[in-house]
Amino acid sequence: MLCASAAWPPLVRAWGDEGHQIVALIAQHYLDARVELRVQALLASDRSALVSGSSMASEATWADRYRDADRDADRRHYEQTRQWHYVDIELSSPNLARACFAHPALPPATPASAGPAEDCVVDKIDQFEAELRNARTSPDERRLALQFLLHLVGDVHQPLHASDDRDHGGNRKRVSAPGMHAGNLHHYWDTEFVRLLGEDAQSVSQRLLGRISASDIEAWQRGSPADWARESFWLAKAVSYGALPPADGGGRYRLSVGYVRDAISAVQLQLSRAGVRLAAVLNRDLRQ
C-alpha cells in the first residue's frame, strides 16, 4: 500500500517533458513573489536555445537537452552529466553511499556544473543548492545551478531513478499493459503513466495542486535529497518492482489494471512531492 492520505486517488528522461513541467508548475505556485522574480531574472539570461522560452516549465527540461545535445557528436556533456540524473540504489542490497560513488567532493575551485562525471543526483542537488544560495557565485553558474535544480529535484522523485534491479533502472524489463503500447518498465514510469494523467501539464498541475493539503506541505518539506532518494527507492521496491507479475515465457511482464492504477497513484504523489520540495529549495536559496 502507498503511504498517501485518503485525498489521493489510487533513453532515460525521468518523467519525460510533461512530468518535469508539472513539477515546475506546482513549484511555481508556491514560490514567494520576490523569489519568483529572481528565478525569472536568472532564467532570462539563458542563451543556449536548448528549450523554448525561459519559463520555469520550459527550463525544467533544459538539463536533458543539455545532456543530449552532443550525444551524437563528441559526447562531452553527455558523458559528464548523464549519471547526475539518478542514483542506482541496488534493490537487493541498498547502499546510498555506494550508489553515489562514495560521495566525491568537488575539486577545489571547481563549479558544480563542471564536477566529476561519477556523481549522483543526491550530491548534485546539494552542490547546486550551495551555489544557488551563495550570492558570490558567478551569474552564469548561478543560472546553471537553477537550471539543473529545476530538473534534478524532479528526477530524484522518479522511483526508477533511485533504484536498480541490475536492469539499468528498469530499462531492460519489457512490459505491456492493457490499452498501452509495449515498452520497457523505465519508460512506462517516465512517460506512459504520466500521460495517463492528461496531455496538458497545466491542467494536470492544477488538479494536483487542488489535492495538496497544508499538512502535506509541512510533511514533505522535511528531509534532505538523500531522504527523498530513499523514499523513492522504497516506493520502487514496493510498487515499481515489488508489484510486478512474473515474466511470461517470452520474458515480458504483463502489467495488470491494478498495477497501472497503483502506479498512477504513486506518480501523482511523487510529482506533487517534487513540486512542493522544489519550491521549498528555491524559496530557501533565493530569498536573501
Name each model feature, range by range.
Residues P9-L11:
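N-terminal signal peptide c-region/cleavage motif recognized by signal peptidases
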Residues M1-A7:
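Bacterial N-terminal signal peptides
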